[in-house]
């Protein structure tokens, strides 16, 4: 009997020598191009080695990922992908994380409401200038200088765990991709070379702001000639 499409996909036939954290980071980088990844479950027990679950927020994302990445060479082995027999909440409950996530959400909501109530109870003259000042300074948005179109892209704001394979998996889906060059001693920057300016530009536009990890949005500019 076929397994019905759901938000969670099951992956096996992966290289079981890869460390759990590196595996999860690489899976996130690969699968989040298809949509919002809620969670990745990779257990290092003997029974679960070389296997993982990727949980998407949208059903369409899991379907696209399954179709596009079936047989994708991942750390030297073709991935086998199918829909999971159980959906995301069940897996989260198995791991004991579902209730914790809900508690955190409720705590955050309660704290926000408390802060709003405290602000509303202040005297009219209080807090307003400070709030304005906070808004003016809290969220600076520094612009990354860009250079004229070039066949080489410059990446920055990369997380410490970035490796050549993670970046290659992201960029080799674009026509004209040639290679990724990391900078010795610098984990936060890299260069990606394409065959021409136009192909580099297409990849730049598509992956601008892509989050390799949830806290690091990649910044892409043309490299200086």
Swiss-Prot record:
Domain RRM: 7-86, 151-225
GO molecular function: RNA binding
Keywords for the protein's UniProt record, in alphabetical order: Acetylation, Isopeptide bond, mRNA processing, mRNA splicing, Nucleus, Phosphoprotein, Repeat, Ribonucleoprotein, RNA-binding, Spliceosome, Ubl conjugation
Subunit-structure text: Identified in the spliceosome B complex. Identified in the spliceosome C complex. Present in a spliceosome complex assembled in vitro, and composed of SNRPB2, HPRP8BP and CRNKL1. Contributes to the binding of stem loop IV of U2 snRNA with SNRPP1.
Modified residues (Phosphotyrosine): 151
Crosslink site: Glycyl lysine isopeptide (Lys-Gly) (interchain with G-Cter in SUMO2): 111
Protein name, as recorded: U2 small nuclear ribonucleoprotein B''
Record field: compositional bias (Low complexity): 113-123
Described purpose of this protein according to its UniProt entry: Involved in pre-mRNA splicing as component of the spliceosome. Associated with sn-RNP U2, where it contributes to the binding of stem loop IV of U2 snRNA.
Domain of life the protein comes from: Eukaryota
Modified residues (N6-acetyllysine): 111
Family to which the UniProt record says this protein belongs: Belongs to the RRM U1 A/B'' family.
Assigned GO CC terms: cytoplasmic ribonucleoprotein granule; fibrillar center; nuclear speck; nucleus; U2 snRNP; U2-type catalytic step 2 spliceosome; U2-type precatalytic spliceosome; U2-type spliceosomal complex
Organism of provenance: Mus musculus
Compartment(s) where it occurs, according to its Swiss-Prot or TrEMBL record: Nucleus
Chain positions covered by the region annotation Disordered: 100-144
Sequence intervals crossing the membrane: none
Comp. bias intervals (Polar residues): 127-140
GO BP, sorted A to Z: mRNA splicing, via spliceosome
PANTHER family hit by this protein: U1 SMALL NUCLEAR RIBONUCLEOPROTEIN A/U2 SMALL NUCLEAR RIBONUCLEOPROTEIN B
